[in-house]
C-alpha cells in the first residue's frame, strides 16, 4: 500500500517540532517537505528549527521551504512574550541542536505546496499548524488545485472553550485573522483541530521520561518537550497540550477525533472563530471541527511511534 504523502506548514516551536517528529515516526506517511511561516518564532528561525529536527532524525534530505514572514494585517513580525516563555529563546526549548548541516530550499513555500497539490492530488494531505498566511496565498493563487488534495487540516480556533491568546482567540487565528477569514471563506472543505480537542491531549514529563535514556536524539527531544510541558499550562505534572501533533495525527487518522462537528465558520478581526446566521442553515457544511478526542489512544500511539523512531535513530 502506498504511503500517504504529507506537507506540514508550521511556525516551528516545540509542539510543531513534535508534530514533525510524529510524521517522521509514522511508517505510513511520506513527508514531502516542511513549509514555514512566522508565529511562535520568526520565519528564518522556523525554517532552521524545522531543518534541525529533520537532521536530528537523519532526514535532512527532506526540503524546508520558507513562506510568509508576517501577517496580512501588519508589515512586520513581532514575537509575543508568551511564545518566548513557552517555546524558549530559540523556539525549541533552548536546546542546542548544533549548526544546521543542510540548506533551506530556494523555492517559496506557496509554490511548493501548489506544485505538490497539482502533482499528487488526492494522495496529498496538507497540515497547517501556524498562522494561515501561506494557505491564504495558496487559495488566491490556485484554489482549484487545493480542492483536489485528499485533506486539508488546520490547527486553530476555539469554539466551546476560551482562547489561548484572548478570551475568544486562539493564537494561530489571531496572528493573521485576515488570512484565516480567507481560508474559512473559501470553497475548500477543511478539517479544524481547535483548542476544544487539543487541550484534552496533555502530555506530562513523566509520559516521555524514557526518551532521555535511549540516546542523544531521545535526550534532545525530551529536553525540548520538557521545556514546553513545564511552562505551557503551569507545571510539570499538568503537562502541555499537543496542539500540532494532534492535527497531524487527525489528518492521517480522523477516527482519533470522537466528535467532528459540521459547520460553516468565519474568522473575525478579534480572532474569534464563529458561524454567522446566514451560514447556519446552508445545506453544505464546509468545515468539520474536532470537539473531542480519544486521548488515551492518541497518547499511546504517539509515544509508541516516537519512541520507536528514537530507538532506530
For each predicted feature, which ranges?
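Active-site histidine-anchored catalytic micro-motif
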Residues: 2-10, 14-52, 96-198
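Conformational coupling and interaction surfaces
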Residues: 2-4, 22-23, 28-30, 171-174, ...
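Metal-dependent C-N hydrolase catalytic cores
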Residues: 4, 47-51, 55-119, 285-294, ...
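Short N-terminal amphipathic alpha-helices
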Residues: 32, 61-66, 263-265
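Short secondary-structure transition/capping segments
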Residues: 44-45, 77, 203-207
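A residue-level signal for conserved active-site and pocket-lining positions in enzyme catalytic cores
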Residues: 64, 183, 248
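Short, active-site-adjacent cap segments at secondary-structure transitions
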Residues: 71-73, 134-135, 199-202
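Short, surface-exposed amphipathic charged segments that create phosphate/polyanion-binding patches used
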Residues: 78-85, 166-170, 208, 282
Amino acid at each position: 500500500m502506498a504511503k500517504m504523502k504529507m506537507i506540514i506548514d508550521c511556525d516551528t516551536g516545540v509542539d510543531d517540532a513534535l508534530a514533525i517528529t510524529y510524521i517522521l515516526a509514522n511508517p505510513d506517511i511520506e513527508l514531502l517537505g516542511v513549509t514555514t511561516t512566522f508565529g511562535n518564532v520568526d520565519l528564518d528561525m522556523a525554517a532552521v528549527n524545522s531543518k534541525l529536527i529533520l537532521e536530528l532524525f537523519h532526514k535532512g534530505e527532506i526540503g524546508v521551504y520558507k513562506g510568509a514572514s508576517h501577517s496580512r494585517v501588519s508589515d512586520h513580525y513581532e514575537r509575543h512574550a508568551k511564545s518566548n516563555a513557552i517555546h524558549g529563546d530559540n523556539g525549541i526549548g533552548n536546546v542546542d541542536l548544533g549548526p544546521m548541516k543542510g540548506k533551506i530550499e530556494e523555492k517559496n513555500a506557496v509554490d511548493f505546496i501548489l506544485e505538490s497539490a497539482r502533482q499528487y492530488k488526492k494522495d496529498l494531505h496538507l497540515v497547517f499548524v501556524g498562522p494561515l498566511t501561506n494557505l491564504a496565498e495558496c487559495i488566491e493563487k490556485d484554489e482549484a488545485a487545493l480542492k483536489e488534495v485528499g485533506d486539508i487540516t488546520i490547527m486553530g480556533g476555539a469554539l466551546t472553550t476560551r482562547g489561548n491568546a484572548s478570551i475568544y482567540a486562539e493564537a494561530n487565528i489571531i496572528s493573521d485573522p485576515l488570512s484565516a477569514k480567507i481560508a474559512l471563506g473559501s470553497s475548500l472543505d477543511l478539517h479544524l483541530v481547535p483548542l476544544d480537542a487539543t487541550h484534552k491531549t496533555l502530555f506530562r514529563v513523566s509520559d516521555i521520561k524514557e526518551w532521555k535514556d535511549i540516546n542523544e536524539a531521545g535526550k534532545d527531544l525530551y529536553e525540548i518537550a520538557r521545556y514546553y510541558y513545564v511552562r505551557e499550562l503551569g507545571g510539570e505534572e499538568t503537562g502541555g497540550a499537543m496542539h500540532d501533533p494532534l492535527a497531524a495525527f487527525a489528518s492521517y487518522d480522523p477516527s482519533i477525533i470522537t466528535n467532528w462537528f459540521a459547520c460553516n465558520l468565519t474568522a473575525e478581526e478579534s480572532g474569534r472563530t464563529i458561524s454567522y446566521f446566514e451560514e447556519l442553515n446552508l445545506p453544505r457544511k464546509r468545515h468539520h471541527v474536532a470537539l473531542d478526542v480519544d486521548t488515551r489512544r492518541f497518547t499511546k500511539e504517539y509515544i509508541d511511534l516516537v519512541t520507536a523512531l528514537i530507538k532506530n535513530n
